[in-house]
Amino acid sequence: MPEADSSVLQIWGGHPLRGHVKISGAKNSALVIMAGALLCSGDCRIRNVPLLADVERMGEVISALGVRLTRQADIIDINASEIKTSKAPYELVTQLRASFFAIGAILARLGVAQMPLPGGCAIGARPVDLHVRGLQAMGAEVQIEHGICNAYVPGSGGRLKGAKIYLDTPSVGATETLMMAATLADGETILENAAREPEVVDLANFCKAMGANIQGAGTSTITIVGVPKLHSVDYSIIPDRIEAGTFLVAGAITRSEITLSSVVPDHLIPLIAKLRDIGVTIIEESPDCLRILPAEILKATDIDTLPHPGFPTDMQAPFMALLTLAEGDSIINESVFENRLRHASELNRLGADIRVKGNTAFVRGVPILSGAPVIGTDLRASAALVIAGLAAEGKTTIQGLHHLDRGYDQIDVKLQQLGAKILRVREEPANAEVAANNNASPAPIST
């Protein structure tokens, strides 16, 4: 894993991309499926796991519970036959929001769990009240004190009980947490207004492969009938739809022809529809392969982010970068998370014309972007800056790579292989702006 705290990305824009890129496994599947492996007392082999800082950190959380975990290439093996402690480490969980979701699996296995409140990207309030109320409905006693969530199941058996749970919002994390908890509960659990994201379906399929009884994943009503025990599994996670979308947008903004493999087109329907709206041609070459063709003119469009199957909030920032060069005025309404438009000011540093009011961004297309030093403020914002840098004239230097490395598997290497002039350079932060003002062309990049 690159040491992003002392590195910057330098991008010399204006070069078309060409070639093929293989999409890695889904970050948001990998994290929750690793947590789901705690439900099983046998061996779990998880394939197609991306190389990410978040995955590495999740592995550290699981190992800290006393669980055996090994990794080789894109395969992770987990044996949770013995979970030695129910207390997750504060310093790790507070850095990774998804690690909190393991509370459902730990509570289901042990009848007790102690989990610090989560961390991750600072993109607005993402409370855990839905998780807590759902676990309480299943019979758990839950208290939050001093930033620690303490949960236990009263009684000698320590087994959660099935319940009918309505989620006020279709929270992905709450749906996944409660689905995991319900797999080993006594009786039937029904989750109403459940999240429908592909990663929720992937977790359900993983649990079903271990012997769980889950019906309705991918719809707003999920029914889980608890079983006494789950068995070993060998499972491959789905491709990352957000990484795929990011490369499609990178191809669109650079007017390039590239091919993406290891994709699920059905997971990209809203994004592909918007790309076609603005004039981009997307061809489904095969059931797991897409090709993007360059558009002569990019047209403005409006976007409202929504829970799946709507336009994904994780693609809002990358698509905003694309719309900075579209002809006309676009409106982007971020309705899923608050405080998720901070990348607009950084895009404006590159010459974009974006005005933000509340959770809405008004984007007026400009003829060109110009390279400048910028800082990624969160994971998807960093991706947006990479995309803009690929199209900008001159040199763009991006700081804050620890965000990017949380969610993209070697994105700079993959872009190099497509012909982008992009380099990861280790340097002290104080020198980054000085380096950014040096507009010399890079040495040829070996691919």
Curated annotation (Swiss-Prot):
Give the enzyme class: transferase
- Asked if the record carries the keyword Translocase, the reply is no
Q: Which organism is it from?
A: Trichormus variabilis (strain ATCC 29413 / PCC 7937)
The family classification in the record reads: Belongs to the EPSP synthase family. MurA subfamily.
Q: What is this protein called?
A: UDP-N-acetylglucosamine 1-carboxyvinyltransferase
What is the documented function of this protein? Cell wall formation. Adds enolpyruvyl to UDP-N-acetylglucosamine.
Q: Which GO terms describe its cellular component?
A: cytoplasm
Please give the catalytic activity noted in the UniProt record: phosphoenolpyruvate + UDP-N-acetyl-alpha-D-glucosamine = UDP-N-acetyl-3-O-(1-carboxyvinyl)-alpha-D-glucosamine + phosphate
Q: Which GO terms describe its biological process?
A: cell division; cell wall organization; peptidoglycan biosynthetic process; regulation of cell shape; UDP-N-acetylgalactosamine biosynthetic process
Residue numbers bearing the 2-(S-cysteinyl)pyruvic acid O-phosphothioketal modification: C121
Q: Which InterPro entries match?
A: Enolpyruvate_Tfrase_dom, Enolpyruvate_Tfrase_sf, MurA_subfamily, RNA3'P_cycl/enolpyr_Trfase_a/b, UDP_GlcNAc_COvinyl_MurA
Q: Which annotated residues bind phosphoenolpyruvate?
A: K27, N28
Active-site residues are C121 (proton donor)
Where, in this chain's numbering, is UDP-N-acetyl-alpha-D-glucosamine bound? R97, R126, P127, V128, D129, L130, D314, V336
Among HAMAP family, the record links this protein to: MurA (MF_00111)
| Record localization | Cytoplasm
User: What does the record give as EC number?
Assistant: 2.5.1.7
CDD domains, sorted: UdpNAET
Q: In which pathway does it act?
A: Cell wall biogenesis; peptidoglycan biosynthesis
- Give one GO molecular function term: UDP-N-acetylglucosamine 1-carboxyvinyltransferase activity
- Gene that codes for this? murA
For this UniProt record, the keywords arranged alphabetically read as follows: Cell cycle, Cell division, Cell shape, Cell wall biogenesis/degradation, Cytoplasm, Peptidoglycan synthesis, Pyruvate, Transferase
